[in-house]
Swiss-Prot record:
NCBIfam families: bcct
PANTHER family: HIGH-AFFINITY CHOLINE TRANSPORT PROTEIN, HIGH-AFFINITY CHOLINE TRANSPORT PROTEIN-RELATED
Intracellular or extracellular location(s): Cell inner membrane
Keyword terms, alphabetized: Amino-acid transport, Cell inner membrane, Cell membrane, Membrane, Stress response, Transmembrane, Transmembrane helix, Transport
GO cellular component: plasma membrane
Domain of life: Bacteria
Entry's transmembrane regions: 33-53, 71-91, 109-129, 165-185, 214-234, 251-271, 286-306, 337-357, 372-392, 420-440, 467-487, 496-516
Record function comment: Involved in the uptake of the osmoprotectant glycine betaine.
Protein's GO biological process: amino acid transport
Source organism per UniProt: Vibrio parahaemolyticus serotype O3:K6 (strain RIMD 2210633)
Protein name: Glycine betaine transporter 1
Main localization (coarse): membrane
Membrane topology reported for the UniProt record: Multi-pass membrane protein
InterPro entries: BCCT_CS, BCCT_transptr
Length: 523
């Protein structure tokens, strides 16, 4: 091995994986990352008990919108940089580098790998927003993209293009930067599977000190709060769907039952590990999602399948104006939708990025970015076209609840669309099952990620730790719903999104650090 290749590897530092860990009560955790992270979580829960949920939501919402309003340009420009960075790596000689070394073999089949990264990356969001978002843009539910006239033919076209913009290349580029950086420094340089390892070329041994501690603690909090938010809001949405399909009262009791069932199944999954748990559930997820897509596409083929070229062309034609943060005439829509999404994707990136890295050994950089960036974007074009195109068609032709009243409840929009389709009840039941399976994949993969960070980058920490974090996600979600309902959960979401500001700078630094590391790999 040449000197250049060793420059940023584990061999160039005295640090060893897990050297700062403490083994106690069956745990093997990093000191101080685990302790400080747990302390912040406890502090948040105490504050939630002491403070009024409405007051907390108002305060954190104020912080969130202050950040979004003041740094909208930064989020958008950074997102553009990440897309360009990833596309450049695909075509550059660096794309030939194999994660894990030239002789590394992929741990998972291509389809299982795609299933896992897609379930972690988008998951339940596609279920609810693939109908609600295009309808919202078309009808002007909360303004319209680029100031287009609501309910016009151009609005229908741009609604699909703008929805695709929010779920296409940009979010996957954000995830791709984090995932590739972690995978490269872990599998090619032998560093711990932890966020701090990415910055070893920039920080040197300071990465193992407080600079690294802060990065890892931020990643833990953003991931845990993001997952708890997803579980809390998702439980409310799932309960609404169950009520719509089966008539069960969608109150706090049903929401807690949903979270409990999801958490218990996630615990079973994390105990079985990636091969026996996460991979199996992700594969089931992909099959059920594909089944739902095919059924809806065939039933509403004229409106749904016919929207695919419209969505693709609208996305391509409008990606530049939608990516431009300056001189916008649609500022309310721009900040309320695009900038909010970018902040959410960035705050979500430590979780998704680390999980993708965990399952991506053996892929070349070119194969990795193509799979992480291009393949999900193509799948999302089809998904958004089928569901969004059919939903807009119902609005235009005054069909069903969507046609009569437009978007009235985001969590019910998909089920309302199914109501007027043949076999609508069957489609709704499949959708409820898929929502629950998406929950499980988010919870189990998130537990693996948090466990790795709080274990100092170890991937073989005690099973008890993974179980602890899976229960913690569910417990926080239940506690917040119990204390303050949706307002408490939305307060947590606002807090999680606020971490996007420091993480934007962290991700930009990742690009620099990754290039430094990859250049030595080529020597």
């Amino acid at each position: 091995m040449t000197k250049g290749i060793d420059k940023y590897s584990i061999d160039s530092t005295d640090y060893t994986v897990g050297q700062d860990n403490v083994q106690k009560w069956g745990f093997d955790v990093h000191n101080p990352v685990f302790g400080i992270s747990a302390g912040f979580i406890a502090l948040f829960l105490v504050a939630a008990l002491v403070l009024d949920a409405h007051t907390a939501k108002t305060a954190l919402d104020g912080l969130k919108w202050k950040i979004i309003g003041s740094f909208d340009w930064l989020f958008i420009i950074a997102g553009n940089i990440f897309v360009i960075f990833c596309l450049a790596l695909i075509v550059s000689p660096l794309g030939k580098i194999r994660l894990g070394g030239k002789d590394a073999v992929a741990d998972y089949s291509f389809m299982s790998w795609l299933a896992m990264l897609f379930a972690a990356g988008m998951g339940i969001g596609l279920m609810f927003w693939s109908v609600a978002e295009p309808v919202a843009y078309f009808t002007g539910w909360y303004e319209t993209p680029l100031g287009v006239e609501a309910n016009s033919p151009e609005a229908a076209r741009l609604a699909l293009g703008a929805t695709m913009f929010h779920w296409g290349l940009h979010p996957w580029a954000i995830y791709g930067v984090v995932a590739l950086s972690l995978a490269f420094f872990t599998y090619n340089k032998g560093l711990p599977l932890s966020m701090r390892s990415i910055f070893y070329p920039l920080l040197g041994d300071r990465a193992w000190g407080w600079a690294g501690h802060i990065v890892d603690i931020l990643a833990v909090l953003a991931t845990l709060f993001g997952l708890a938010t997803s579980l809390g809001l998702g439980a409310q949405q799932a309960a609404s769907g169950i009520h719509h399909v089966f008539g069960v009262e969608p109150g706090l009791g049903l929401q807690i039952v949903v979270i409990t069932v999801v958490t218990l199944l996630a615990v079973v999954s994390v105990v079985r590990g990636i091969d026996g748990g996460v991979k199996v559930i992700s594969n089931i997820n992909m099959v059920v999602a594909f089944l739902l897509l095919i059924l809806v596409g065939l039933i509403g083929w004229a409106a749904s399948l016919g929207s695919i070229p419209t969505t693709l062309m609208a996305y391509v034609e409008n990606i530049i104006p939608l990516s431009n943060p300056f001189g916008r005439t649609d500022e309310a829509w721009f900040q309320g939708w695009t900038v909010f999404y970018w902040a959410w994707w960035i705050s979500w990136s430590p979780f998704v990025g680390m999980f993708i890295a965990r399952v991506s050994r053996g892929r070349t950089v070119r194969e990795f970015i193509t799979a992480v960036l291009i393949v999900p974007t193509v799948v999302t074009v089809v998904w958004m076209s089928v569901f969004g195109g059919l939903a807009i068609d119902q609005v235009v032709n005054k069909v069903g609840e969507l046609g009569a009243n437009g978007l009235t409840d985001v969590s019910l929009a998909m089920f309302q669309m199914f109501d007027v389709l043949p076999f609508g009840n069957i489609l709704s039941i499949i959708a409820v099952v898929l929502v629950l399976v998406f929950f499980i994949t988010s919870s189990d993969s998130g537990s693996l990620v948090i466990d790795s960070i709080t274990a100092g980058g170890k991937v073989d920490a005690p099973v008890l730790q993974r179980v602890f974090w899976a229960f913690m996600e569910g417990a926080i979600a239940v506690a917040l719903l119990w204390i303050g309902g949706s307002e408490a959960v939305q307060a947590l979401q606002a807090g999680a999104i606020s971490t996007a500001l420091p993480f934007t700078f962290i991700l930009l630094a990742m690009c620099v650090s990754l290039l430094m590391g990859m250049k030595t790999e080529r020597q």
